[in-house]
Structure formats: C-alpha cells, structure tokens
Design a protein with these regions (language model features):
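Active-site beta-loop-alpha junctions enriched in small/polar residues
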Residues: 10-14, 39-41, 70-74, 94-96, ...
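C-terminal helical cap(s) of enzyme catalytic domains, especially alpha/beta-barrels
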Residues: 106, 186, 198-216
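N-terminal amphipathic alpha-helix/helix-capping segment at the start of soluble metabolic enzymes
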Residues: 1-13, 20-21
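Glycine-rich, proline-tolerant flexible connector loops at the mouths of alpha/beta enzymes
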Residues: 33-51, 141-149, 199
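Conserved anion-binding
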Residues: 18, 60, 76-79, 84-170
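Conserved, mostly hydrophobic/aromatic
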Residues: 19, 26, 37, 81, ...
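A structural motif
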Residues: 28-33, 86, 133, 190
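Hydrophobic faces of well-ordered beta-strands that scaffold small-molecule active sites
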Residues: 5-10, 34-36, 57, 65-69, ...
Length: 216
C-alpha cells in the first residue's frame, strides 16, 4: 500500500549558503515536504541550524516542514520547533529521557509528533510510545551525516516497525534514499521518503523527484 507516497527534500545536502533558493528549487521540482535536520553537536557530533533558520525559511514556502531533532534535550526544544512552523517534529528514542511528555507537548504546540530511531535500535523501542505517536522516522543510516548508503537490513526494520505502528500511522524513511532504494522502502511500509543527495546532487531535480515515486 503506497497511499500517496510523499517525497521530502532534506536541505542538509543543499548549498547551506543559499537555503532559501534551495527550498524554492525543491518546491519547483515537485517535492511534497521539506526535511530539516537539526543537530546540536551533542547527541550527534555535527552542528547544523536552529529555530532562527526555520523561522526564516518558513516565509519562503507553504510546504510542510518536518523537523528531525538530533539533539540531547528535546523536551526543551521540540515544542519550540512546532511553534516556529514545523508541521511534524521527531525526537530520538535513544535520548535518555521520558518521551511521552515531549511527544504530547509537540502535539499541544500544533504539530504531529514522531519518534526517530537509528539502525542499531530495535523496533520494539517504539512499542511503549505508539499511543503518543503520529509517525515514526526510521533511519536507514546512522544519524548525523548526509550522503550515506542505505543499510542492508533497512527493509526488515521498516517492515517490523510498520507492524508495530499499524496501518494508520505514517512511516518516514531517511537515509540512502535514491531511485535504486525507494521502491524497497515503500514496499516495506514507508510513506514519506526523505532524500538529500539524490535530489540536490542531481542534474535535474524534477526528474530525480519523479524517479523516487512509485511507478503505477
């Protein structure tokens, strides 16, 4: 079941000196969403952008913003990203804190709440939180760096998480998504495909977007 697979452009792989133009180019190429990788230099070693960048880009497009928070203190920051204009906010299940309150706070702030999990995290980590989730963000590469390859066990993980979440909750798949891996991610239950290098590294972004969509 594809139920209208969506393509999210990860601007981590765009020209960071021209993010407004990158968002506009992605919209013109036909993507459905903009994916924002928020890194704090603590939960992951890299450091990217914060709320001020989200607010600046919010005026560039009406496309939904998906915030992927790779940060050590999501309880403090997650509701603020929702308030800044993100339609979805995902926090990492690996962060050692109680997640249900943060997920509920994201919803109260007006966004959909999600849990993200790295490849080494078992699917059962989602089980205790399903009632508080709108979606799962399944990482098919290690969080913190763009341009990695889709991991061999990705299909099995997506399928297992789909069974845990049931049919009604969405699964976003992030990492190594390109024309050669997109169909596999969708076949196992992915609803939103997050792509960066495959889009911003393409000669023709519109063709790259269409290359990720399921074929009729």
């Amino acid at each position: 079941m594809t139920r209208g697979v969506q393509i999210a452009a990860s601007i981590l792989n765009a020209d960071l000196g021209a993010l407004r133009e990158a968002v506009q180019a992605a919209e013109q190429a036909g993507v459905d969403r903009i994916h924002l990788d928020i890194m704090d230099g603590h939960f992951v070693p890299n450091l990217t952008f914060g709320i001020a960048t989200v607010e600046a880009l919010r005026g560039v497009t009406s496309l939904p913003f998906d915030a992927h928070l790779m940060i050590a203190n999501p309880a403090l920051w997650a509701p603020r990203y929702a308030a800044a204009g993100c339609q979805t906010v995902a926090i990492h299940v690996e962060v050692p804190e109680r997640h249900q309150g943060t997920l509920d706070a994201i919803r109260t702030a007006g966004a959909q709440a999600g849990l993200a999990a790295d490849p080494g995290t078992p699917a059962r980590a989602f089980a205790a939180h399903v009632a508080h989730l709108d979606f799962a963000l399944v990482m098919t590469v290690k969080s913190g760096f763009g341009g990695q390859s889709y991991q061999p066990d990705a299909a099995a993980r997506i399928k297992e998480i789909r069974v845990l979440l049931g049919a009604e909750r969405l699964i976003h798949v992030d990492g190594g998504i390109r024309s050669s891996t997109a169909a596999d991610a969708v076949a196992q239950g992915g609803d939103v495909l997050v792509a960066g290098t495959a889009l911003f590294g393409a000669a023709q972004m519109r063709a790259a977007v269409e290359g990720l969509r399921p074929k009729a």
